[in-house]
């Protein structure tokens, strides 16, 4: 899976798991259709909606030189009812 970097676990993304929505950081050059195809193929689920936003890079200083990290894209993927991604399911205790 070249386009998907990793799953995101923030307060908001954990709250969205209850709505059957999963959050991933993806390559900034990937398109929505590519990500949808990869998620459906790799996890064996049906995607009904996708939301995305671009997160800006941050400044990093190395001595007198000011650099920056690369920006990246975050996708919130909504699955059809009845489908889930097993390793990302929130366990209730």
Curated annotation (Swiss-Prot):
PROSITE patterns cross-referenced by the UniProt entry: RIBOSOMAL_L23 (PS00050)
Alphabetized SUPFAM superfamilies for the sequence: Ribosomal proteins S24e, L23 and L15e (SSF54189)
GO MF annotations, alphabetized: mRNA binding; rRNA binding; structural constituent of ribosome
Compartments it resides in: Plastid, Chloroplast
Ribonucleoprotein among keywords: yes
A single cellular component GO annotation: chloroplast
Keywords: Chloroplast, Plastid, Ribonucleoprotein, Ribosomal protein, RNA-binding, rRNA-binding
GO biological process per UniProt: translation
InterPro entries according to UniProt: Nucleotide-bd_a/b_plait_sf, Ribosomal_uL23-like, Ribosomal_uL23/eL15/eS24_sf, Ribosomal_uL23_CS
The UniProt record lists the keyword Ribosomal protein: yes
Family: Belongs to the universal ribosomal protein uL23 family.
Description of how the protein assembles with itself and partners: Part of the 50S ribosomal subunit.
Function summary: Binds to 23S rRNA.
Full protein name: Large ribosomal subunit protein uL23cz/uL23cy
Species the sequence originates in: Coffea arabica
Lineage: Eukaryota, Viridiplantae, Streptophyta, Embryophyta, Tracheophyta
Designated gene of the protein: rpl23-A
């Amino acid at each position: 899976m070249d386009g998907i970097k990793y799953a995101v676990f923030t307060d908001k993304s954990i709250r969205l798991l209850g709505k059957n929505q999963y959050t991933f950081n993806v390559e900034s050059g990937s398109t929505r259709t590519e990500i949808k195809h990869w998620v459906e193929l790799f996890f064996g689920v049906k995607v009904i909606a996708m939301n995305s936003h671009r997160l800006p890079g941050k400044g990093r200083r190395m001595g007198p030189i000011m650099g920056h990290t690369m920006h990246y894209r975050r996708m919130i993927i909504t699955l059809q009812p009845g489908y889930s991604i097993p390793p990302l399911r929130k366990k209730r205790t």
